[in-house]
Each structure stands twice: as C-alpha cells, then as structure tokens.
Amino acid sequence: MNIKGSPWKGSLLLLLVSNLLLCQSVAPLPICPGGAARCQVTLRDLFDRAVVLSHYIHNLSSEMFSEFDKRYTHGRGFITKAINSCHTSSLATPEDKEQAQQMNQKDFLSLIVSILRSWNEPLYHLVTEVRGMQEAPEAILSKAVEIEEQTKRLLEGMELIVSQVHPETKENEIYPVWSGLPSLQMADEESRLSAYYNLLHCLRRDSHKIDNYLKLLKCRIIHNNNC
C-alpha cells in the first residue's frame, strides 16, 4: 500500500516513533517544542504526545521501584507500610474504568493536573537526597532525574490541554502537600529505606493512574469514546 500523501502517513509515523521511544526508553519529544506561550500544536497531537510521555514516565517509575526493591528491601516487609500511605491518597480518584468514565471531564482533567503538581516537590527532594547518598546507585539516580524533568513537561502539556478544552478554567493551585522529607533524612537506615520505598511505591502507583486516565480522556475527547 502506498501511503505517500495519505492522511494515514502522519498517524503511522507517530505510532512508529512512539513505539520506538518506549522500546528504547528514550525520552519523547517535547509536548510543545516552542514553549507553552507559542504552542501551535493541535489538541489531538497534544494528547498523543501526553499519552506517550505519561507511559514513558510510568515505565521509568516501575523500573526505578524494581531496582530499589531488589537492591535494598529484600525481606524487609515494607509493602505493608506503604499501602494507603501516599500523600495523594486524599484525592478522590476513580478506582476502575467504569468510575473513570462516569467522571466529569473538567474534574478529570483537574485531577490529573493536581496529581502532577503534587509530585513537583517530592521528586525534587528525591533527586537531591539520592544524589547525596554514599555510593548512590547511578541507575536509580538517573531515572529519578529523568522522571522529575519529564513530569514537569507533562504538567506543562496538561495545562495546555486544559486551556484548549476548557479555556474558561482558572488555574487551580490546590493539590496535596508532601511532608515526607524528614523521613528521607532519618539517621536510622531501616526507617530511611522504608520512606524511600514508600515514595517510590506511590510514584509508581500515581504514574500508572495518570497513564490510564490520559488514555481514557483521549478516547473521550478526541475520539468521542469510539475506541
């Protein structure tokens, strides 16, 4: 089939590039290369790029959690302490696809933005604290740095999406505040490692939620639920 000049060409190229990025764990292109103030990207493309970026962040979060778990937490039983102890647990989030589909579109977008904003501070301190560790594992540090950077980009992209879908929406600065820094700095190694485990567990959980939520929203807004 000759796709030259076909309307499928752009979509096919985007799919190929997206798959290549995910397989190679290479950072996706910026959601809006010219910056938010001069963004000329269509809503469809904004969603396409946001979905690729959120999936990339979730993959990195899962890999970082697995590496930390294998290196530091074998047999310590941290998982029992991590359940329901995330700083974002106060947010009312859909528990399954059915609940998500019933959620108001505007509230759904605001929820994603709130989750992303709530991770700005913990990701900054995660990078700072891991960098200061003796014999800091490079695999974990490099992923933490990348996740922090890409989460900021995803937040910028989501703010652009909100401005296009609901231009009347005022910026909402209300989001859960993280207070876990003292726990990452504890002198007791067991307590400190437990705090790191909890933070990485929550990051993996929330990045998975955002990844799923964005796919559902893209289906609803771009494809009118026909996907």
UniProtKB/Swiss-Prot annotation:
Annotated glycosylation sites: N59
Any one GO molecular-function label of the UniProt entry: hormone activity
Gene Ontology terms: cellular component: endosome lumen; extracellular region; extracellular space
GO terms under biological process: cell surface receptor signaling pathway; female pregnancy; lactation; mammary gland development; negative regulation of angiogenesis; negative regulation of endothelial cell proliferation; positive regulation of canonical NF-kappaB signal transduction; positive regulation of lactation
Chief location category: secreted
Function: Prolactin acts primarily on the mammary gland by promoting lactation.
Protein name according to UniProt: Prolactin
